[in-house]
Structures are given as C-alpha cells and as structure tokens.
Amino acid sequence: MIPLAAWEEVIDASGVAPRIEAMLPIGVRRRQLSVRTLLAGLCLAQADHRPAHLTRAHRALTALPEQDQARLGVVTAWKDGPHLLTYRQTERTFGLIADALAKDEPDGLPSAALAGICDDLLEASIPAEFKDASRSLAVDWTDLETFSRPPPAKGGECADPEASWGHRKNNLPGPKDELFFGHYASAGIMMPDEGGRPLPELARRATLSSCRHDPARALVPVLTAMPAAGIPLGDILADSGYAHRDADAWALPLRAAGAALVQDLHPHDRGPKGTHHGAVIANGSLYCPNTPRSLLELGPLSRDAAPEAVTAHDARAAELARYKLGRITADDPDGYHRIQCPAAMGKIRCPLRPASMTLDRGRPEILQPPQHPQECCTQQTITVPPEITAKTAQKHNYPSKAHRRSYARRTGAERGFATAKDPASNNITRGWCRLMSLTPLMLSITCLLVVRNQRILAAWYTRQAENQRRAAAGLSPKTRKRRRKTLASLATRPP
C-alpha cells in the first residue's frame, strides 16, 4: 500500500490546503480536522481500494498509528482528555469545503476555484522528472452515475439537482446504448511525444460536468488554461466524438492555444466535402481537382487488417498525398495560409504545369486536365481562409501511416479510465460516491486520479528496476504477450 507520506507530499506540493482553509468560515472553536488531513484521508481510503465514502476516510484516519494521529490532529487534547476525531466532524469539514468551492448558482459545471484546486492536485502528483517529458495528451470522457435517483416522471426535484440524463455504451450482452443519470468525467492522460521516450501514463487534467453539458466543450477551458500555467500544449489525441464537434467548440480554441490535433474523423466528415477555388476539400486537406475519387474516399484501416491489407492501404495513402496541395506559409494572425498546386511542387505531372512534365514517370500523371481550369490550376498559389478546414485539419494527413501510428497513442485515455474503473480496485459505478452534487463528486474523482497516478508510478519504477536487472543479466526487457483474439485468428489457429 502507498504510504501516508506520499499523499502528504502531493497535498503539500499542490498548495491547495492553505487556499481552501482561507475560504472556510471561522467559528468560535477551532476545527479539529484540517483540510490537509481530510484530503489525506480521502486518498488513503481510495488507495486501499475503498469507495469514496466519508465513513471510509474517517476509518482510514482513525486507523493510523498513534504518532501520525497526533501529528495530523486526528487525536487532540481537550479539557476532558484526548479526543478522537468523530465522523460528524469529518462530515462537517467536508461539507464546508464543498460549500466553499461550489457555485452560488449551480449550473452543472465546476467553479473556477474548484477547477484550480483539482488541477493543482493532479499536477502535484506528477514527479518533476516527467513534467517536461511530454506535451501530448490523450483525452476521453466516461460516465459517472450519481447516487441520486432520477427525478419523478411526473416532475419534481431529485437529491442531485445538477445531474442529468446522459448516454453511454456498454460491453454487456444485449443493447449497447443506454441512458444513465449523472455526470460526464473527462480526463487528459500524458502520452509520449512522437519519437519520444516512454513515460508513465499519468492523468494530468480532469473535469466533471453535468450530462446537460457537452463534455468536449467542458474540457476545452481546462486544456486551454494549461499554457498560462507554464505547460505548453502539444499533440491532443481524441476520437471522432471530439472531432465531430463544431470547430468553434473544439478545434479552433485548441489550435489557438498551440495544440496540434491528432484525431479520428467522424464518418460524416470523411471524404470529399466541397471545393475551394477548384481544389477538393477532403479529410482536412485540399487536393487536386483530378484526384481519383477512390483515393479521396479512402477510409481508415480496420484494427484487425491483415499485413497485406496494411501495405496496400499505406501505398494508396502515399499516392493520395501526392495530389495534396502543399502548404508554403504558416498561418498569419488571422488564420490564413497559402498553398500550392502539387504539380508546381513537383509531386505529380500535369500538362497545365509544363515544367512538371519533365519529371520522371514514377509520379502520378494527370491525363485529362480540366478544359476550364480554376484558380488552383492557373495561379501559383491560393489563399485558404481558416474556416475552410477549421473542423477537420490536423497534424498528419488522414488516413496516412503517420497518422495511424500517432493516433495509436490515444488508447492511453482508455487505459486511464480502465485503471480507475477496475472492479478489483475502485469501481466508480453507482454508489461509489454517495455525496450529492458536482463539487463533492469532482473532489472524489480527482483524489481517485491522484491515487491512480501513484499506482502507475509505483508499477513504472518496479518495471524499470526489473528491466535494469534483466539488462545486467544480458536479457531483453520483459514484454506482455498480445492477447487480443479475432475470429480470423481463432479460425486459423492450429488445434
């Protein structure tokens, strides 16, 4: 089990305890339970694979050694003798914290104070050696069902007025889509940069929002606030659920904050989607008007594709890249940039660009150029406004080999929630936290992610020590056997 000193170090490094104490009301009698001790108790309870119940936190604090109890104020000297912390005191202190961090008029989103407290706690759980090791984040959201019952069908209030109906998918037999009553929990997990060294997949940012709010829009202010905190944004790895949002809601604010998007496009956003000065808009890029339709409609590779299919797909993606109009300038302050015909750049042969016809015949050739060429074929360059590919433009050509390899890192977000939702440890199903409203839930989920980070770090250091031992013995690092099974692999497996 992770020792108490580890939680105290994280809480002290974050600096959140004094800030919260300053927000709490001051009574006639000094509170026995401090914010620092309560946060340590919440982490201790969840580190012991317990639910986020205040009774569990109280039990964890009262089970500490006598020396730690005296040091943390769990046992204090009253005029009648030593006094052991009671559950009522624990509940009272947590209630004061929740009231201080909540909004005056709850709307299903965290207050600025609550968001800052949770950000600082998560940032403090990341060791200094990994803070600058990567700027890439894999993002995702998951369901967090409230303990409250839904409001009556005939109308009326419920115990958790900030909760709302949401949609989730399950892996159980039967229907895959279902409704739940609660909130969406979003998180950003640190992933290695492209070509960077491996590092532990630590949760760096998280937020909670009612299901009446879009989780993608709720996560944007959390990510865009990171540069102001001295954490520059790098690659943001997201699935099509994020990429399908309006550009103003997701892509544009992240690009303005310095992020590079690496995401899967929604099926409705793939393929040709109009033209700009004659150039075909497809998959976030502009292509020659004579690009073969089959290349423009090239989709992503299936997960269980055979090696021959992978090779053929990569060859077609590389051929498609030759028809792409190349960028020759960076974005100006208004988001405009200029691109050039692929024949003028020497990527294909086209009669409309006589100089390109001197290139070798290994390049694709336009056999039937348009009789009435448009600006993309007659001008040296064309200007692209920011709104043309605002929603779908990203770091790599889609769906190229480079994009597939870079996007493969996004599974870290799935693993992040899988470790936090493991039934063998902390299962955040309904009843995991019985406190109502968004503020107590967000504090609890943040403490859980801090605990998860410490578990990941402990496993990381153990694995590195084992790899060093094996290297000293002349052995290669130990790897895990791939256990994913497909119908094709099962059918061809020998008996």
Residue ranges, per PLM feature:
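Polybasic low-complexity intrinsically disordered regions
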Residues: 30-39, 56-60, 88-258, 262-269
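Short amphipathic alpha-helical "interface-anchor" segments enriched in bulky aromatics
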Residues: 277-340, 386-436
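Basic, amphipathic alpha-helical segments enriched in Lys/Arg and hydrophobic/aromatic residues
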Residues: 405-489
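Long, low-complexity, polar/charged, intrinsically disordered or flexibly structured peripheral segments
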Residues: 148, 163, 328-399
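Dynamic "connector" segments at or just before major functional cores
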Residues: 1-53, 66-122, 463-466, 471, ...
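Short, charged, surface-exposed secondary-structure boundary motifs
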Residues: 270-278
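Short amphipathic alpha-helical segments and their helix-coil junctions
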Residues: 9-28, 163-166, 398, 425-433
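Structural motif
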Residues: 26-37, 176-178, 408, 433-442
